[in-house]
Amino acid sequence: MEGASRHGLATARATLDEATAIPPGAAVTSVDASRVADDLRAVADLLHREPTVRRALTDPGAPPAARTELAARLLGRQLDAVSLRIVQTAVSSRWSRPADLQFALLELSVEALLVEAERDGALEEVEDELFRFARILGQNPQLALALTDPAAPASVKNALLGRLLSGRAHPVTLRLAQQAAADRIHGDVERRLADFSRIAAARRGRVVAVVRTAVPLTDEVIARLGAAISRYFGRQIQLQVDLDPELLGGVVVKVGDEVVDGSVLRRLAAARRALLR
């Protein structure tokens, strides 16, 4: 997302965090974060299906108040009050592209489910389970295809995920895996799960670097690599290491949108391009 959209996402996220926070002196909150997650995902799906609605709710020529009023008219009867407030906050912002609004609502639906994990003290557990399950899908193309197949009913995918994860992973992990499989916008379940893991890491105040390497790394090498990457980016970085033999050697490091490619595969490709000039 570009500048305006990033600001819109941050503003809507602040509304989500404020609405789902446990009040001082209270042990619980009455806000159903799971319902909020379902609502936000439903609105994102609506915007994906209805480009006219998406354009109307992001129209920079319309005053913010007009866009929030339109959201209330269209969605007020279907959404929880907290969900509607988050959507109205989002549509009152400017967006670099109309599609960024639906992407932001999808991300916020993930964060709402992660609030459930936070309340359960299981955010780190969910983050790790999401990352590991994404890697499992990467190593099992047939399983990934079964979960991505647009012709397969959601009930079939949910049942498959239930057999794989129920009793083995936190309930929020299962919900997020089901959400990734149901995502009509992005489609790639493995990538979405990795994205969800990074969102969980961000909620824990951590920045994650995904490191792809051709060979397994020892703990000592991982520690040295982590220190070097932290120095490079000027902040503390947590590594998630992924084996990828196709790289042939070296490593590829991805932090957010920035990629540092030190793989043998990249160097061979560069040499090949030089020979063809």
UniProtKB/Swiss-Prot annotation:
- Organism domain of life: Bacteria
Residue intervals passing through the bilayer:
none
Q: What is any one of the record's Gene Ontology cellular component terms? A: proton-transporting ATP synthase complex
Per UniProt, subcellular location reads as: Cell membrane
Q: Which InterPro entries match?
A: ATP_synth_OSCP/delta_N_sf, ATPase_OSCP/d_CS, ATPase_OSCP/dsu
Bilayer topology term: Peripheral membrane protein
MF terms per GO, please? proton-transporting ATP synthase activity, rotational mechanism
Instruction: Please indicate if the UniProt record lists tRNA processing as a keyword.
Output: no
For this protein, the record's SUPFAM superfamilies field holds: N-terminal domain of the delta subunit of the F1F0-ATP synthase (SSF47928)
Q: Which family does it belong to?
A: Belongs to the ATPase delta chain family.
Q: Which NCBIfam families match?
A: ATP_synt_delta, PRK13430.1
On subunit structure and binding partners, the annotation says: F-type ATPases have 2 components, F(1) - the catalytic core - and F(0) - the membrane proton channel. F(1) has five subunits: alpha(3), beta(3), gamma(1), delta(1), epsilon(1). F(0) has three main subunits: a(1), b(2) and c(10-14). The alpha and beta chains form an alternating ring which encloses part of the gamma chain. F(1) is attached to F(0) by a central stalk formed by the gamma and epsilon chains, while a peripheral stalk is formed by the delta and b chains.
Q: What is this protein called?
A: ATP synthase subunit delta
Q: Name its species.
A: Frankia alni (strain DSM 45986 / CECT 9034 / ACN14a)
Upper taxonomic classification of the species?
Answer: Bacteria, Bacillati, Actinomycetota, Actinomycetes, Frankiales
